[in-house]
Each structure stands twice: as C-alpha cells, then as structure tokens.
Amino acid sequence: MAFSPTPQQRAIIEHTEGPVLVIAGPGSGKTFTLVQRITHLIVDKSVPTEQIFVATFTEKAANEIEDRIARELLSRNIVVNFDDMYIGTFHSICLKILEDNRDFTRLKKNFTVMDQFDQTYFFFQHLAEFEKVGQVADFVGSDKMSRWLKASTICDWMNKLSEELVNSEKLASDSHPKLQMLGKWHLLYQQLLEQENLLDFSMIQAETLRLFKNHEEAG
C-alpha cells in the first residue's frame, strides 16, 4: 500500500537548500519521510550515492532505513550499490570512513577494533609497561587490587581521555602528579595501539575527527 506525503512531509522531502531541523514524535512518519527524502535526492536531484549520509543510534534502525530505501528505489526500477552510501550508527559510519581513508591515518591494513573485554585484556597484558610509568595503586590510593582490576581502572581512564579529546602531551607535562601519570599512560597507550594496529571503541570517532582536521582531502 503506497502512502502519499502530507504537505509538511513534502516540504521536508523537497528541501535541499541548507540544513533542515525536524522535530517529530513517535508514529509521525519520520522514517517514511527520511526514505522519501533520500529517494528524492538520488532520483530527482541526481545526488551520487556516495554523498548520502544517514546516521542512526542503532544498527536495527540503520538496517530498516537501508531496506526501505532499497525497496523504494526498486519500485522505480533503480538499483544502487549500498556499499557506496554511509548508512549506519555513528561508530559504524566512522569506521567506514577510516577504512576508506586508511592511508591518511595511523592505521594499517586489517586493523582490529577491540571491544570492552579485548581492551581490558590488552591493559592486563601490558600492565607491567604501564606500571613502569606510574603505579595504579598510587593513582587510586589503594594497593589491594587484583591485576585485572588495575587493568580495568587504566582502561576506564584511557577511554575518558579519548572521548574528551584530551591533549595527552599537555597532560603529561602537568604539574599535578596524577594528571601527569594519566597523560603518560595515554601516550604509551597510543604508542602500543599503533604498534599492534589496534583501535578501541572510544577512539573511533576521535580518529575520524582527527582525519578530517588534518586531511581536508579525505572523505
């Protein structure tokens, strides 16, 4: 059963000059309008598929949007390569951008993205190297910690620094001993990640931002 856009939806679908902010509640036809807008851009405005960028909060939502776009285009006898489009969660889109522009990053071919367990285990394996920089017990004020808890503690702090885009070199030269320790840990962490061709979940967006800041030709 085909649906026709309302006048308000039609205005959103056909708006192409500058950004448009749409505030709508559940069941108001947001996905329908978005799918129609993308179809309009591809079919009526001849926008290349590689210039289509749709970010969602969940993979389920991204898959649904992709499926509905495919069905809408197929109903018009149009077939496109969805690998060219950027449709997914913020993290999955950033990963695709990094993969497409790997030559401009520190990453090498077949890099690995660590999940939470992998990352904690990474710190567990390299704990001795981090404790040469600074003892976890000194940082938290307790020496009654297992090696795994120490690894988990460093992991949590490194993620916070990555997510907040903290300047590690500046932090490493801070006059406060604990801040200095965090900065030196983070510098060591980045060095080890580069050596082992790894990326963690918290650094995906930061690496993408760094890519765009340092290489305008990337995209």
For every predicted segment, state its role:
Residues N63, D67, R71, F124-Q125, ...:
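Solvent-exposed alpha-helical segments within well-ordered globular domains of core cellular machineries
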Residues H40, R71, S75, Q125-E129, ...:
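A generic structural signal for well-ordered alpha-helical segments enriched in polar/charged residues
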Residues M1-I23, S28, F32-T33, Q51-F53, ...:
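Accessory N-terminal region flanking or inserted into the helicase ATPase core
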Residues M1-L107:
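P-loop NTPase Walker
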Residues T56, N77-I78, D83-F90, L95, ...:
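Conserved ATP-dependent motor core of P-loop NTPases, especially the RecA-like helicase ATPase domain
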Residues L34, K60, E64, H91, ...:
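Charge-rich, low-complexity amphipathic helices
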